[in-house]
């Protein structure tokens, strides 16, 4: 896409939001409580602040304020307000390719924010535990928050990821012509590195005329030992392993497709 000569500030708002899910099987109530405590500590407010601070570094944002909170009995949230940073638009790379992991990218941002909220949960029956983190990176300016996508997916290793990217508003060029997007994008997947693509099955649902892009990701490899909390698969019978595997796969598919799957 040809570089635009704008009249004034770039008023486009670019929002990247995604949910990441981590699934676990905990056999007993004690194990379920242990998993929730473990994941709650792993993604506490301090760690999330470190991740979001590095995200700001990747997209070149100046941090104005950080609000963070751990919650009882579990969960955490962090919100960072960021400000614009002067930049020569000619230096901004708008091409459709994976972002850094991490690498400094200068951005031009205003009225922008980055936030994350976590939601650990479990059910007393069935042994399933899930951890969900909601992340949003919203910027106004010449750079897309998609540049931070690679870093965030690597930092929050997940079984399932759902990603939404939307460009809102418009900006004017020097001739007064309105532009409703200022960079090329066919798929969010084009902003992911090859190592991420090799790990997940992915599907897109895009509404190009509305500048709305959606990608869902489901981990390809399934190894039961990675989903057991304080229990080794070899300690279980073959029948128990099959029941747990079927239970986990059903849970993951329901989250991935966003609907309940009837038992067969």
From Swiss-Prot:
The record marks 111-112 as: Cleavage (non-hydrolytic). The modification Pyruvic acid (Ser) is found at residue 112. Belongs to the prokaryotic AdoMetDC family. Type 2 subfamily. One of its GO terms (biological process) is spermidine biosynthetic process. Its cofactor is pyruvate. Keywords: Autocatalytic cleavage, Decarboxylase, Lyase, Polyamine biosynthesis, Pyruvate, S-adenosyl-L-methionine, Schiff base, Spermidine biosynthesis, Zymogen. It catalyses: S-adenosyl-L-methionine + H(+) = S-adenosyl 3-(methylsulfanyl)propylamine + CO2. Binds 1 pyruvoyl group covalently per subunit. GO terms for cellular component: cytosol. This is S-adenosylmethionine decarboxylase proenzyme. It comes from the Bacteria. Is synthesized initially as an inactive proenzyme. Formation of the active enzyme involves a self-maturation process in which the active site pyruvoyl group is generated from an internal serine residue via an autocatalytic post-translational modification. Two non-identical subunits are generated from the proenzyme in this reaction, and the pyruvate is formed at the N-terminus of the alpha chain, which is derived from the carboxyl end of the proenzyme. It comes from Klebsiella pneumoniae (strain 342). Pathway: Amine and polyamine biosynthesis; S-adenosylmethioninamine biosynthesis; S-adenosylmethioninamine from S-adenosyl-L-methionine: step 1/1. Catalyzes the decarboxylation of S-adenosylmethionine to S-adenosylmethioninamine (dcAdoMet), the propylamine donor required for the synthesis of the polyamines spermine and spermidine from the diamine putrescine. Its EC number is 4.1.1.50.
């Amino acid at each position: 896409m040809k570089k635009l000569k704008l009249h004034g500030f770039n008023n486009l708002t670019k929002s990247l939001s995604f949910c990441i899910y981590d699934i676990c099987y905990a056999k007993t109530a004690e194990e379920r409580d242990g998993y929730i405590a473990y994941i709650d500590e792993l993604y506490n407010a301090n760690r999330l602040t470190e991740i979001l601070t590095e995200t700001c570094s990747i997209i070149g944002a100046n941090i104005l304020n950080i609000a963070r909170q751990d919650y009882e009995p579990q969960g955490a949230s962090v919100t960072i307000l960021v400000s614009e940073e002067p930049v020569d638009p000619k230096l901004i790379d708008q091409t459709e390719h994976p972002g850094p992991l991490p690498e400094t990218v200068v951005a031009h941002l205003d009225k922008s924010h980055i936030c994350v909220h976590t939601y650990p949960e479990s059910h007393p029956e069935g042994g399933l535990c899930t951890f969900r983190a909601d992340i949003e990176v919203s910027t106004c300016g010449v750079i897309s928050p998609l540049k931070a996508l690679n870093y965030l997916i690597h930092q929050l290793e997940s079984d399932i990821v759902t990603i939404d990217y939307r460009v809102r508003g418009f900006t004017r060029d020097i001739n007064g012509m309105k532009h409703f997007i200022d960079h090329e994008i066919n798929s969010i997947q084009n902003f992911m590195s090859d190592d991420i693509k090799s790990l997940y099955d992915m599907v897109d649902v895009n509404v190009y005329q509305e500048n709305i892009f959606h990608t869902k990701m489901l981990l390809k490899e399934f190894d039961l030992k990675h989903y057991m909390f304080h229990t080794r698969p070899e300690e279980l019978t073959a029948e128990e392993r099959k029941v747990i595997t079927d239970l986990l796969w059903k849970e993951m598919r329901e989250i991935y497709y966003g609907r309940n799957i009837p038992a067969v």
